[in-house]
């Protein structure tokens, strides 16, 4: 190849998604088992009538729906459409946030392990990733504060954390945000927030209103079941939203994805009720794994984390032999999606047999 590419890209691996194996049970990508509601399907079908036209690049109708949805849940006037940005999945917004804050010589802090895309996107931008080890499978916020330097531009807090399934205590998160210098962007990545229960539900939108340097990311891929359409959003200060628009790939949020997201917002109560089924299965799977002898942190997501260390690859290999596709993370552990009950039963049968083997 004769084209001159950026030499630093040679050392940056491509993102590796969960595998899809025909005929196997895929519990590797944290997808919901529920398909779109009839009303969402109808909106998608209607949107196909206009596929010869470009989508709304300003996604105005979707932003208005999101603002109204937030008003309904947080109180009138919580956020305006000007405080909402839409992206091709929240992962694209992660990249945009890095682009508007960080370049060569700058630093971006995040926990490790956390979302695997963070270090790849940071390095692609030419910035330096600063990985702060987890403590008890969750963010060590004190250590993250200690990692801040005069080169820090952005901090990601993946909450619930992917892949370890844990959440940060809401009061601790509030103290953390208050302690971060106001010129540093704090991005709270809440792809799995709809699966949090009890007193661990974060008040992240309140943090956005109180602190102009805080951004909350949400997605329609998980609880809303639109992973195949790639659409997510950010809630932030209007100046940050304006900056995000400058690095947005034009028309990347398609007409179909916008229509599906709007219909999903209209059906939010019905869609989010489905998460109760997932949570019930999560609790059942967690209890069964612990009873079988596994050690795992309490999950507040639609997946569980098995910190298997040096036994990780053996677990993954043997699972594949049993037509189960799980997600390995080096020799740290395995992430397992909560699926349909019969799929969870198949996984539990394998897991019980595996842990009893030498």
Swiss-Prot record:
The keyword Transferase applies. Its EC number is 2.6.1.57. The modification N6-(pyridoxal phosphate)lysine is found at residue 222. SUPFAM superfamilies: PLP-dependent transferases (SSF53383). PROSITE patterns: AA_TRANSFER_CLASS_2. Homodimer. It catalyses: an aromatic L-alpha-amino acid + 2-oxoglutarate = an aromatic oxo-acid + L-glutamate. GO terms for molecular function: aromatic-amino-acid transaminase activity; histidinol-phosphate transaminase activity; pyridoxal phosphate binding. GO terms for biological process: L-histidine biosynthetic process. Pfam families: Aminotran_1_2. Its cofactor is pyridoxal 5'-phosphate. It comes from Mycobacterium sp. (strain JLS). It comes from the Bacteria. Aminotransferase that catalyzes the conversion of aromatic amino acids and 2-oxoglutarate into corresponding aromatic oxo acids and L-glutamate. The keyword Translocase does not apply. Keywords: Aminotransferase, Pyridoxal phosphate, Transferase. This is Aromatic amino acid aminotransferase.
């Amino acid at each position: 190849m004769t084209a001159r590419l950026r030499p630093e890209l040679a050392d940056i691996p491509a993102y590796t998604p969960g595998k899809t194996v025909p005929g196997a049970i895929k519990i590797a990508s944290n997808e919901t088992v529920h398909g779109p509601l009839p009303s969402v399907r109808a909106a998608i079908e209607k949107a196909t009538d206009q596929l010869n036209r470009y989508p709304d690049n300003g996604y105005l109708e979707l932003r208005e729906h999101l603002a109204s949805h937030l008003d309904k849940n947080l109180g009138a006037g919580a956020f305006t459409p000007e405080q909402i940005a839409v992206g091709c999945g929240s992962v694209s917004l992660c990249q945009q946030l890095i682009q508007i804050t960080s370049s060569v010589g700058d630093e971006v802090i995040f926990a490790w392990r956390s979302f695997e895309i963070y270090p790849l996107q940071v390095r692609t931008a030419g910035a330096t990733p600063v990985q702060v080890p987890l403590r008890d499978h969750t963010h060590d916020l004190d250590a993250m504060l200690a990692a801040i330097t005069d080169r820090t531009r952005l901090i990601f807090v993946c909450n619930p954390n992917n892949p370890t399934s844990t959440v940060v205590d809401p009061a601790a998160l509030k103290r953390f945000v208050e302690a971060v210098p106001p010129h540093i962007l704090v991005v709270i990545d809440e792809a799995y927030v709809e699966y949090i229960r009890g007193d661990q539900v974060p008040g992240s939108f309140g943090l956005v209103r109180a602190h102009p340097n805080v951004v909350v990311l949400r997605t329609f891929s998980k609880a809303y079941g639109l992973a195949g359409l790639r659409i997510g959003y950010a809630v932030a200060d209007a100046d940050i939203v304006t900056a995000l628009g400058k690095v947005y790939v034009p028309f990347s949020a398609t007409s179909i994805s916008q229509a599906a997201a709007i219909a999903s917002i209209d059906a939010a109560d019905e869609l989010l009720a489905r998460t109760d089924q997932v949570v019930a299965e999560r609790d059942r799977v967690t209890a069964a794994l612990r009873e079988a002898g596994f050690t795992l942190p309490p999950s507040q997501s639609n997946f569980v984390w098995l910190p298997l260390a040096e036994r990780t690859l053996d677990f993954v290999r043997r699972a594949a032999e049993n037509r189960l596709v799980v997600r390995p993370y080096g020799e740290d552990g395995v992430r397992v999606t909560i699926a349909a009950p019969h799929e969870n039963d198949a996984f539990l049968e394998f897991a019980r047999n595996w842990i009893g083997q030498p």
